[in-house]
């Protein structure tokens, strides 16, 4: 039973519990009209201390399509946070009005602190460069739906692997499935963190390698997970400008790829995927965005215990 649980890290749910969420998402995709009123009378609070388009809209659309309502803020300056209110006090107050909360915060661990003080389920909608578990559920549902399996895959992760919380969460999650391998492509300054390399991959004897050129790995990949270099994580603008266009996926590089490879991206993109890839059937990032709404619908329904 997932009722009343928090989702702070992709490892919080067992593989069986994840499959439970995915099966419900499948049902919602097949017959959405059956779920139009399952959250009647329920309220989701979206507590976004950082800018967001897809994640916030996806959560809000998910709750509305389940028949529930949404309250919240999209920037801290529009709430009592601007007056210095703590995360603990904010979630305690919000718990008086809402049944479930989704929180995005620039500080790592902030949603976990909120969960400690909360009487309602808390979903981590991204905390700093740490984790983004609902994006991971989105990615897993997309791969599962389009590939048919989450095992025996070679996954390439490209771009900002140091600050990219979506990559950290995805590697952790896919490491739990059988016979998956990873290829990491990034500038030296933005390499995958040591804790992912040592505590997740090496500790569990999971095969991985790091390459400097995309072309060196494209032919073996089943999934290519592109990420942008995140301007908001840099203190030095010169460093950002120097690194932002390090890896760009275009039609020429796609010539090296398998016919059934999938290109994913958590979005927003900047320059790292050329617009010509939008016309390539292997470009699955907008399908991925839609799967994000469905998996959040399933997650909300499970945590509230209405399904």
Swiss-Prot record:
Positions of L-aspartate binding: 83, 165, 228
EC number(s) per entry: 2.1.3.2
GO molecular function, one term: amino acid binding
One Gene Ontology biological process: 'de novo' UMP biosynthetic process
A Pfam short name: OTCace_N
Keywords: Pyrimidine biosynthesis, Transferase
Recorded catalytic activity of this chain's protein: carbamoyl phosphate + L-aspartate = N-carbamoyl-L-aspartate + phosphate + H(+)
Annotated carbamoyl phosphate binding sites: 54-55, 104, 132, 135, 267-268
Pathway, per record: Pyrimidine metabolism; UMP biosynthesis via de novo pathway; (S)-dihydroorotate from bicarbonate: step 2/3
Enzyme category, top tier: transferase
Keyword Acyltransferase in annotation: no
Similarity-based family: Belongs to the aspartate/ornithine carbamoyltransferase superfamily. ATCase family.
Physiological role: Catalyzes the condensation of carbamoyl phosphate and aspartate to form carbamoyl aspartate and inorganic phosphate, the committed step in the de novo pyrimidine nucleotide biosynthesis pathway.
Subunit record text: Heterododecamer (2C3:3R2) of six catalytic PyrB chains organized as two trimers (C3), and six regulatory PyrI chains organized as three dimers (R2).
Name assigned to this protein: Aspartate carbamoyltransferase catalytic subunit
Lineage: Bacteria, Bacillati, Bacillota, Clostridia, Eubacteriales
């Amino acid at each position: 039973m997932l009722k009343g649980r928090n989702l702070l890290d992709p490892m919080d749910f067992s593989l069986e519990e994840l499959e439970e969420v995915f099966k419900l998402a499948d049902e919602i995709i097949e017959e959405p009209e059956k779920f139009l009123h399952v959250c009647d009378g329920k309220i989701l609070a979206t507590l976004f201390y950082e800018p967001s388009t897809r994640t916030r809209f996806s959560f809000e659309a998910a709750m509305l399509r389940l028949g529930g309502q949404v309250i919240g803020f999209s920037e801290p300056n529009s709430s009592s946070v601007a007056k210095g209110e703590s995360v603990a006090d904010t979630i305690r107050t919000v718990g008086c009005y809402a049944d479930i909360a989704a929180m995005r915060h620039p500080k790592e661990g902030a949603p976990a602190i909120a969960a400690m003080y909360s009487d309602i389920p808390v979903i981590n909608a991204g905390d700093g460069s740490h984790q983004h578990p609902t994006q991971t559920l989105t990615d897993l549902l997309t791969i599962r739906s389009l590939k048919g399996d989450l095992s025996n895959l070679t996954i390439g992760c490209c771009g900002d692997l140091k600050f990219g919380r979506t990559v950290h969460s995805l590697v952790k999650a896919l490491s739990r499935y059988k016979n998956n391998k990873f290829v990491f492509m990034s500038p030296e300054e933005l390499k995958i963190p040591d804790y992912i390399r040592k505590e997740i991959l090496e500790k569990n004897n999971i095969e991985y390698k790091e390459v400097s050129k995309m072309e060196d790995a494209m032919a073996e990949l089943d999934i290519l997970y592109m990420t942008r270099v995140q301007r908001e994580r840099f203190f030095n603008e010169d460093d950002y400008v120097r690194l932002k266009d390090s890896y760009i996926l275009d039609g020429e590089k796609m010539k090296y790829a398998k016919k059934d490879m999938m290109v994913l991206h958590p979005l927003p993109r900047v320059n790292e995927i050329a617009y010509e890839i939008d016309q390539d059937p292997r470009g699955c990032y907008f399908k991925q965005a839609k799967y994000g709404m469905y998996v959040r619908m399933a997650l909300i329904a499970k945590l509230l215990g209405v399904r």
